[in-house]
Structure formats: structure tokens, C-alpha cells
């Protein structure tokens, strides 16, 4: 039971909204975390910090004169790196980084999202389970961390571990099972 506020207390609290805080960003973080099934809030904050650093770097590069060779070289390096990572869908201009480099763009490169896109799992939650249980490898490396970011080049090498029960079931379903591999 709370007492009724006095007049001067009401006046002081008139402009304070207890439901919406500035630091919550309108609950954008929980929405992104739920969409991409991010388990640690720190991962979201790391991605947010990375996006801010990239935007800040792009802004500082844009302040240099357009004919500066240093600016041209580093703009191209930054754009190539972001395209190779898969954060950018096309090789674009440095001015597009403000809108295109987002936390969602980085989250789309997470291993569970790539597995869902490649139809290796029905949902992102299932993909997270498969990764944590040790069923997935990228290239020759077994991956147990769902926060693993897959580059554009490594996307083709996402596959099941050789002795995985899921791989065995898939091969049996397709009638491609080789008894020598699973003996």
C-alpha cells in the first residue's frame, strides 16, 4: 500500500516516465535477442558496440578529403572486410554503412541463423541445440558455441559432424548410407 503523493512530489515526478527508460532503447535488444535466439545479453551489447565502432570509423573516414589516398584505401579495406564477413549484402559506398551495419546484420551471420537458412534445422532454437550438443562443424572444426560468426566463404562448409546421429539419420532417409563410414 502506497501513500498518495503530495503536491510538490507530483510536480517533481510529472516529467518522469517509469515505464520507458532511455537506456532500454524501447526494448529493441530483447526483440533482436528473441528473433535470433541470442542467449547472452552481453553478446547483443558486443554486437552493438561493434556496430558503433564501425559507424564511428566510417564517419571519421568521411571527414577526410575525398581525394586523399589514405581515405580511399581504408574505405575500400573496410567495405571489403564487411562484405567478406557477410554483414553487407553488396559492395556499397561508405555512406551506406550508417543504415546497413546493424546488430541484426551481424546476428544474421551467427551459425544457428545460417543453419536455419541452409535448412539444416527447422528453427533457430533447434539449430542452437544441435550446435551445443556438438553435431555441427564448420570446415574441419567442431563448433560448440552458437555465437560463432560464419563468414561468406565458410558458409559452404557448414555441415554435420561425421559421427553425428543426425547425419546418419539423414543419409538413411536419402538411401545414401555407407556402412563403412558408420561402423
From Swiss-Prot:
Family, per entry: Belongs to the universal ribosomal protein uS4 family.
Coiled coil: none
Compartment(s): Nucleus, Nucleolus
Name listed for the protein in its UniProt record: U3 small nucleolar ribonucleoprotein protein IMP3
A Pfam family matched in the record: S4
S4 RNA-binding domain span: 109-175
Subunit structure: Component of a heterotrimeric complex containing IMP3, IMP4 and MPP10. Interacts with MPP10. Component of the ribosomal small subunit (SSU) processome composed of at least 40 protein subunits and snoRNA U3.
Main localization (coarse): nucleus
GO biological process, one term: ribosomal small subunit biogenesis
Highest taxon listed in the record's lineage: Eukaryota
Keywords: Nucleus, Ribonucleoprotein, Ribosome biogenesis, RNA-binding, rRNA processing, rRNA-binding
PANTHER family, per the entry: 30S 40S RIBOSOMAL PROTEIN, U3 SMALL NUCLEOLAR RIBONUCLEOPROTEIN PROTEIN IMP3
GO cellular component, one term: small-subunit processome
Task performed by this protein: Required for the early cleavages at sites A0, A1 and A2 during 18S ribosomal pre-RNA processing.
Record GO terms (molecular function): RNA folding chaperone; rRNA binding; snoRNA binding
Native species: Saccharomyces cerevisiae (strain ATCC 204508 / S288c) (Baker's yeast)
Amino acid at each position: 500500500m502506497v501513500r498518495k503523493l503530495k503536491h510538490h512530489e507530483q510536480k517533481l515526478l510529472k516529467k518522469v516516465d517509469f515505464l520507458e527508460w532511455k537506456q532500454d532503447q524501447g526494448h529493441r535488444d530483447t526483440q533482436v535477442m528473441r528473433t535470433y535466439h541470442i542467449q547472452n545479453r552481453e553478446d547483443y551489447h558486443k554486437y552493438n558496440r561493434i556496430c558503433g565502432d564501425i559507424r564511428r570509423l566510417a564517419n571519421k573516414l568521411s571527414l577526410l578529403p575525398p581525394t586523399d589516398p589514405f581515405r580511399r584505401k581504408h574505405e575500400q579495406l573496410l567495405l571489403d572486410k564487411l562484405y567478406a564477413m557477410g554483414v553487407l549484402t553488396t559492395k556499397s559506398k561508405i555512406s551506406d554503412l550508417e543504415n546497413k551495419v546493424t546488430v541484426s546484420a551481424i546476428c544474421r551471420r551467427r551459425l544457428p541463423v545460417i543453419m536455419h537458412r541452409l535448412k539444416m534445422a527447422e528453427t533457430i532454437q533447434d539449430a542452437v541445440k544441435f550446435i551445443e550438443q556438438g553435431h555441427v562443424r564448420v570446415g574441419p572444426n567442431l563448433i560448440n558455441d552458437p555465437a560463432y560468426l560464419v563468414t561468406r566463404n565458410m558458409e559452404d562448409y557448414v555441415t554435420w559432424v561425421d559421427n553425428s546421429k543426425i547425419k546418419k539419420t539423414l543419409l538413411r532417409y536419402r538411401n545414401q548410407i555407407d556402412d563403412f563410414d558408420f561402423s
